[in-house]
Amino acid sequence: MDRIYIFDVDGTLTPSRLPMTQDFSIFFSLWSMDNTFYLVTGSDIDKTREQVPWYIFDRAQAVFTCCGNEMWIGKEQQYRKEFKPPQDLIDFLWDKVNNSMCPIRIGNHIEDRETMLNFSVVGRDCSQEQREEYYEWDKTSNERKNIARGIKYGWPDLDAVIGGEISIDIYKKGDDKSQTFEHIKNKHT
């Protein structure tokens, strides 16, 4: 069997939440002509298309977005797993936003991607500088770690995983990026 490559997007192929650099996109584009690869990300399809140039996106065997809960081949969605968060979880998250010791609050704290939630105390709309400030603050406060622990305790059927620099990804247990391996294995065996 030929080699198959699986790449995470944020922090691997691109700087966190930013587009692929021009130099790297040229390198990766040339590399992708002779290799079989898949992309996996916690981001939704729109953000992924902002980060990855279309000519690389289209060469991927598939792109798994929202932690593998959506699969795309080119512009066509192949599947989607729905997730409806319970209201008491939403209330818990708002309580964490309102009672955080971090002074930065920007907006877009709870992003419902319909297949998962992405939660951020500082807010998804923060600037790169605010993102870095929060990330440094969280290293010592362990705020995200403690919130994730609270989610896992209060909702044992859900998983909460620290994502990137400012957020927590929340989804049904087992509906994480590892689920993509089964799809890839089935296609190549």
Locate each region found by the language model:
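A general structural motif
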Residues: 1-2, 34, 60, 114
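Asp-based phosphoryl-transfer active-site loop
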Residues: 2-19, 39, 181
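Residue-level marker for buried hydrophobic side chains located in beta-strands
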Residues: 5-7, 63, 189
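Conserved strand-loop elements at the edges of beta-sheets that form or border functional pockets
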Residues: 7, 42, 65, 112, ...
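Short glycine-rich anion-binding loops that position phosphate/pyrophosphate groups of nucleotides
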Residues: 12, 69, 124
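Glycine/Thr-rich phosphate-binding loops of Rossmann-like dinucleotide-binding domains
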Residues: 15, 73, 127
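Active-site phosphate-binding/coordination module
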Residues: 18-109
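Conserved acidic, metal-coordinating active-site core of Asp-based
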Residues: 103-189
